[in-house]
From Swiss-Prot:
Keywords: Signal. Pfam families: OAF_C, OAF_N. The lineage of its organism: Eukaryota, Metazoa, Chordata, Craniata, Vertebrata. Coiled coil: none annotated. It comes from the Eukaryota. Belongs to the OAF family. Residues 1-29 form the signal peptide. This is Out at first protein homolog.
């Protein structure tokens, strides 16, 4: 890993055409590389009611050949959220395309990627997901279970050029966030113990230095380093399999899914406040 302080300041990304930002989550699934296997990926489109009563649409795809699941949604403010569960590599990828406020001098969009370890009880297996069938596509659904908020301190950067060694999905999903891909030391240890090369990861400033940095919302100078905060939610996803009992069967059998909603907050170092202009001090 590179020593702390040697990471380049992310350069301004070229403006993403507005047409791409307006694409449906269904079309965005093609960016993930999901479905690269011989079988066509199974897809569900789900309308979901948020806690504030707004309704969004999610696209979920499963590829049992690649052993992966993807989820795409567009938040009411236009932000595009993508999630990949890569079961082969024990990797979760969260990608956010955040629309900028041009009147505030922000760029048209900013991309972030967060990469963490996938635990196999986080979401149902890809094979089970691939067997789900679309029912009542116009029905508005709510998650049966709200899982606890997960707060993650991202203290390691991922080297985009080597990211394919961590997950083959990373190059496609995080292509717009090459200088803003973050993970955690504890997850790095897990992956390197399983053979992932350490060149994939780059050190960020030490935890003590980060602890002393103010939150970006409290910094006035846009050129100063600070600790950025970003939150996202997966509004509806199949988190568990349901099992039923029958007198005719000696053992429980799979008979459905349980849906969950889960929120995440990520804290991470940025070398300039201008890379975190959405983070307003509460």
């Amino acid at each position: 890993m590179r020593p702390p302080g040697c990471r380049d300041v992310p350069s301004a990304r070229p403006a993403l055409p507005l047409l791409l930002l307006l694409l449906s989550p269904l079309l965005l699934g093609a960016l993930h590389g999901v479905g690269a296997g011989s079988g066509a990926p199974a897809e569900l489109r789900v309308r979901v009611r948020l806690p504030d009563s707004q309704v969004i649409e999610e696209s979920l795809q499963a590829d049992s050949d690649a052993d992966s699941i993807s989820l795409d949604l567009r938040k009411p403010d236009g932000t595009l959220i993508s999630f990949i569960a890569d079961f082969k590599k024990d990797v979760k990828i969260f990608r956010a395309l955040i629309l900028g406020e041009l009147e505030k001098g922000q760029s048209q969009f900013q991309a972030l990627c967060f990469v963490t370890r996938l635990h196999h009880n986080d979401i149902i297996p890809s094979e089970a997901m691939a067997k789900l069938r679309q029912k009542n596509p116009r029905a508005v659904r709510q998650a049966e279970e709200v899982r606890g908020l997960e707060q993650l301190h991202m203290d390691i950067a991922v080297n985009f050029s080597q990211g394919g060694l961590l997950s083959p999905h990373l190059h496609n999903v995080c292509a717009e966030a090459t200088d803003a891909i973050y993970t955690r030391q504890e997850d790095v240890q897990f992956w390197t113990e399983r053979g992932v090369d350490s060149s994939v990861f780059e050190a960020l400033p030490k935890a003590l230095e980060q602890a002393e940095l103010p939150r970006c919302g409290r910094v006035g100078d846009r050129g100063k380093p600070c600790t950025c905060h970003y939150s996202l939610s997966l509004a509806w996803y199949p988190c568990m399999l349901k099992y039923c009992h029958s007198r005719d069967r000696p053992a429980p059998y799979k008979c459905g899914i349980r849906s969950c909603r889960k929120s995440y907050t990520f804290d991470f170092y940025v070398p300039q406040k201008q890379l975190c202009l959405w983070d307003e001090d509460p």
